[in-house]
Amino acid sequence: MAFLKKSLFLVLFLGLVSLSICEEEKRETEEEEHDQEEDDKSEEKRFLSLIPHIVSGVASLAKHFG
C-alpha cells in the first residue's frame, strides 16, 4: 500500500511539473507574439509618418523638372 501511495504521488508530482513547464512555455510564446505585434505596429507608424515627406519631395521634384 505504501508503495502504491508513493507511486501515485510521484506520478502526480511529475504531471504537475510538466504542466508547469508547458504553461511557462505558452506564456513566453504569447509574450513574444505580443512583442512582435508591437514592433510591427511601430514600424507601420514610422512608415506612415514618412509618407507626407515623400509626397512633398516628389512634388518639389515634379515642379523642378516639370
Curated annotation (Swiss-Prot):
Biased composition (Acidic residues): 30-41
GO BP terms in the entry: defense response to bacterium; defense response to fungus; innate immune response; killing of cells of another organism
Chief localisation class: secreted
Key words of the record: Amidation, Amphibian defense peptide, Antibiotic, Antimicrobial, Cleavage on pair of basic residues, Cytolysis, Fungicide, Hemolysis, Immunity, Innate immunity, Membrane, Secreted, Signal, Target cell membrane, Target membrane
Propeptide: 23-46
Tissue note: Expressed by the skin glands.
GO cellular component, one term: other organism cell membrane
Modified positions (Phenylalanine amide) in chain numbering: F65
Subcellular location: Secreted; Target cell membrane
InterPro entries referenced in this protein's UniProt entry, alphabetically: Frog_antimicrobial_propeptide, FSAP
Signal sequence annotation: 1-22
Protein family per UniProt: Belongs to the frog skin active peptide (FSAP) family. Phylloseptin subfamily.
Known role: Antimicrobial peptide with high activity against Gram-positive bacteria, moderate activity against Gram-negative bacteria, and moderate activity against fungi. Acts by causing bacterial membrane disruption inducing leakage of the intracellular content followed by cell death. It adopts an alpha-helical amphipathic structure in membrane environments. Also shows highly potent antiparasitic activity against Leishmania species. Shows moderate hemolytic activity on human erythrocytes (LC(50)=25 uM). Is also active on human monocytes (IC(50)=22.5 uM).
Protein name according to UniProt: Phylloseptin-S2
Record organism: Phyllomedusa sauvagei
Taxonomic lineage of the native organism: Eukaryota, Metazoa, Chordata, Craniata, Vertebrata
